Amino acid sequence: MSQLPKIIIVGSGIIGASIALACQDLNADILVLEQGTSGGVASGTSFGWINASFAESSAYYALRLEAIEGFRNLGLRLDLKDSLRWQGTLWWEDAGADFDAQWTKMLSNGYAARLLNKDEVSVLEPNLVGAPERAILTYAEGAALAHETAKSILKHVSSNGGKLIENCMVTGVQSHYGRLHGVKTNVGNFDCDMLVLATGAQAQSGMDGLDWSLPMANKTGMILQTNRLPPFLNHTLMTSDVHFRQNVDGSLTAGEIFGGDFNPGANPNALATQTLERIR
């Protein structure tokens, strides 16, 4: 009987957890190493919008459609009712010719979408003050609490023989004649056949021991997460101002400065307060 390939995944966020599950489904022996606690850090500050609204090529559009279907299947497989919501999206981020171009592109792609007028938007979102004159409803879209989803995936992986070690800092990789065979950590060394660095902006720091660099353009944005609130919002709202939604647990997630143009001199708390005021 042949030995299962040993795969180490560094990072337990939504990317690392998903890779762990996919590799386990292919009969690999899985070890996930996390420097903090299960679910990672970055996934807890993810907007988590599941969509195929914007794609620069037909191949990318097809990939994103597959991702939506994959998330639906994952939700059924792992019963992600506490972290995954298929609420659809109301979009009016652009206006005029840009709005028309987006609608035309969705139609040409055959995307599940409908053009709404102001009254129709108000019916769908009765608590929305100042409804737009028109918006696009993309009703096949959803959103996930990425951190909680990652934890659910890892729980499934662990229940099927995978292992997760928390508070484990990877300090470098081990290789012999150019071939990787393990990782160095603060709690000891671990052998593996393959290694996945699912550590986002920290990926380069885990490559000590390899004569190879990973070009990255890390920029700063802002995602807001509120405490739980009574239900008042039915869809993800991609407005001309703030992007926001209400999660399964009642909390709000709001996105600001997605493009990475965050002013390093800005006061994050003041900016967060201003953003919440704009939502109100």
Predicted regions and their residues:
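Beta1/beta-strand and adjacent pyrophosphate-binding region of the FAD-binding site
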Residues: 2-15, 31
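Conserved Rossmann-like nucleotide-cofactor binding loop
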Residues: 15, 38, 202
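Glycine-rich FAD pyrophosphate-binding loop
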Residues: 25-44
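Dinucleotide-binding Rossmann-like beta1-alpha1 core, especially the glycine-rich loop
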Residues: 47-124, 241-243
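Short beta-strand to alpha-helix junction loop
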Residues: 62-65, 91-99, 136-155, 270-274
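Helical element adjacent to the flavin cofactor pocket in flavoenzyme catalytic cores
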Residues: 136-193
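Central helical "cap/lid" subdomain
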Residues: 188-234, 268
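Active-site lid/adjacent beta-loop-alpha segment flanking the redox-cofactor pocket in flavoenzymes
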Residues: 231-280
